[in-house]
Amino acid sequence: MESIEKKEIRPLFIKERIAVYVYCYSYKGTRQLSKFGDVVYTSQKSNYSLLYVNNENLSDLLSKLKDLKFVKKVRVGHIKELDQNFSEAFAQTNLAVKEEIERL
């Protein structure tokens, strides 16, 4: 019981994470990528891996990844830059469909 009470309880904060695509020369080195972040997907055929890493140390991590022998290129995902509010696009599509129906 005492060991449970001594453990520190960490708060459940969600950290900003970003997708990083790592293109490799061969499939062999992809196992080493788990040191840098969470490997979500690895393609044997296309020789790339998808990592999720913390946004805080992104620049340091990118330079470390580029320095690895088996890495061809590193790309950062752009999902944060995109507008994820689709209500406007949905309204425009509805208007276009209604106009098409009225023409018929």
From Swiss-Prot:
Keywords of the record, alphabetical order, are: Cytoplasm
- InterPro entries noted in UniProt: DUF2129
Query: Which gene name belongs to this protein?
Result: ydgE
Top-level taxon: Bacteria
Subcellular compartments: Cytoplasm
Q: Which Pfam families match?
A: DUF2129
HAMAP family for the chain: UPF0298 (MF_01126)
Concerning its family, UniProt says: Belongs to the UPF0298 family.
Which interval of the chain is the signal sequence? none
Principal subcellular localization: cytoplasm
Which organism is the protein's source?
A: Lactococcus lactis subsp. lactis (strain IL1403) (Streptococcus lactis)
Q: Name one GO cellular component term.
A: cytoplasm
For this entry, the protein name equals UPF0298 protein YdgE
